[in-house]
């Protein structure tokens, strides 16, 4: 009953809450109920915050700019209107952000690793996503997903998570769209030449999935979302795999790549 009340409150608040720094999927369709088993919902007493990705039963990846006080994480949700019996709620036990992250730049090293207060149980609607074994290839078709708004011009939250296919873009294309990006950057850009398919308000922290692996974390983009010449920018997870694995193994003093 407690979980049901928490979920009900979350979903009611989610309808009216707009997070300025979050991103959301536009131009997509309802995700298949079994394709987002790793997708995590972040919320607090004010409402919906961000998305995240389960990478094993005890650890979750999200964006560093999604950090907030007193948030919880919800696993196994598909519909606001229909409860899954295997939905689970967890609190963060430990949060890890790159110690060498620029504090005055929320786009820098935009990754956070969270240890849960207790492991989640894998189930029909809950399962982790693999870390990348190699960097993403330009042109690869990848999947974005999230609970964010489905309209680039007004806040319109769906009852179910939406998914869309987009492509990994060459970093030169990204730098042409965003000249402030460094030539060597631990980010990856993804989008389509046509306007419409993109992350938008509400999707920050969620995954960019390529070949069944998490290659990116939704970080930032131009506004309004869905502009073909302004692709979404994602934290490049492959560049942080050593940092992630070191922390999980107990070496919490490790720093992130420059």
Swiss-Prot record:
Main localization category: secreted
Domain Peptidase S1: start-end pairs: 25-249
Signal sequence bounds: 1-18
Pfam families, per database record: Trypsin
Highest taxon listed in the record's lineage: Eukaryota
A molecular function (GO) term: serine-type endopeptidase activity
EC number: 3.4.21.-
Catalytic-site annotation from UniProt: 65 (charge relay system), 110 (charge relay system), 204 (charge relay system)
Residues listed as glycosylation sites in the UniProt record: 44
Enzyme class: hydrolase
Gene3D superfamilies: Trypsin-like serine proteases
Tissue: Expressed by the venom gland.
CDD domains (UniProt xref): Tryp_SPc
Similarity comment text for this entry: Belongs to the peptidase S1 family. Snake venom subfamily.
Subunit field text: Monomer.
Protein name per Swiss-Prot or TrEMBL: Venom plasminogen activator
Organism for this UniProt entry: Agkistrodon piscivorus leucostoma (Western cottonmouth)
């Amino acid at each position: 009953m407690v979980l049901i009340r928490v979920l009900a409150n979350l979903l009611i608040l989610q309808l009216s809450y707009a997070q300025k720094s979050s991103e959301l999927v536009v131009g997509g369709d309802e995700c298949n109920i079994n394709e987002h088993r790793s997708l995590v919902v972040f919320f607090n007493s004010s409402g919906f915050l961000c998305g995240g990705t389960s990478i094993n039963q005890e650890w979750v990846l999200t964006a560093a700019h999604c950090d907030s006080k007193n948030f919880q994480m919800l696993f196994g949700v598909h519909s606001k209107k229909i409860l899954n019996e295997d939905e689970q709620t967890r609190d963060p036990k430990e949060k890890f952000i790159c110690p060498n992250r620029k504090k005055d730049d929320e786009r820098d090293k935009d990754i956070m690793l969270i240890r849960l207060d207790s492991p989640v149980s894998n189930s029909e609607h809950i399962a982790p996503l693999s870390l990348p074994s190699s960097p993403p290839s330009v042109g690869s078709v990848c999947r974005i997903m999230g609970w964010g708004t489905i309209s680039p011009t007004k806040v319109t939250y769906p009852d179910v998570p939406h998914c869309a296919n987009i492509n990994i873009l060459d970093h030169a294309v990204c730098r042409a769209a965003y000249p402030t990006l460094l030539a060597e950057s631990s980010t990856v850009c993804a989008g389509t030449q046509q306007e419409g398919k993109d992350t938008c308000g509400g999707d920050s922290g969620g995954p960019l999935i390529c070949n069944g692996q998490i290659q990116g974390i939704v970080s930032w983009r131009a506004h309004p979302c869905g502009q073909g010449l302004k692709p979404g920018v994602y934290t490049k997870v492959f560049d942080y795999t050593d940092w992630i694995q070191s922390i999980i193994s107990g070496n919490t003093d490790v720093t992130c790549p420059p």
